[in-house]
């Protein structure tokens, strides 16, 4: 049994492509440090879906989507990258999403945000002065 999530991200990188690459590397390291150690990222399933671990889109799908995602959307606006997705995952996956947003916060522009709407309640995090701040 799992939980349904609706996730929204609004991202901008502090130093453009350099910080986008740093973000990808930080997410790769998180996977290396945690996969199989209480966390199952389902890398074999992602590989079957044609999703690797080398691009920002790949990494955002691994952390903020599921193989059975409903409508993964990633669009670049004039200033912000917007990601939206609904998916099913374990109840513990919420903590993974919160952790990784904290990990990548130093590379994000102030005002970058994460909203997680699980079955009940919600989480809202924002980057202020390069740090992850919990709003709700």
Language model features: what each stretch is:
Residues 52-136:
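Charged interaction segments
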Residues 1-41:
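Short, extreme N-terminal segment that most often corresponds to the first beta-strand
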Residues 2, 16-20, 49-53, 93, ...:
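Intrinsic-disorder-associated interaction segments
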């Amino acid at each position: 049994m799992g939980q349904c999530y609706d996730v929204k991200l609004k991202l901008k990188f502090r130093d453009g492509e350099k910080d986008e690459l740093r973000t990808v590397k930080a997410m790769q390291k998180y996977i290396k440090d945690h996969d199989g150690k209480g966390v199952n990222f389902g890398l074999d399933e992602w590989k079957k879906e044609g999703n690797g671990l080398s691009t920002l889109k790949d990494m955002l799908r691994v952390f903020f989507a599921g193989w059975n995602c409903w409508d993964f959307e990633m669009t670049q606006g004039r200033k912000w990258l917007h990601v939206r997705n609904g998916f099913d995952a374990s109840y513990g996956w919420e903590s993974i999403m919160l952790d990784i947003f904290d990990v990548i916060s130093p590379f994000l522009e102030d005002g970058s945000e994460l909203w997680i709407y699980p079955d009940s309640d919600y989480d809202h995090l924002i980057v202020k002065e390069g740090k992850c701040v919990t709003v709700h």
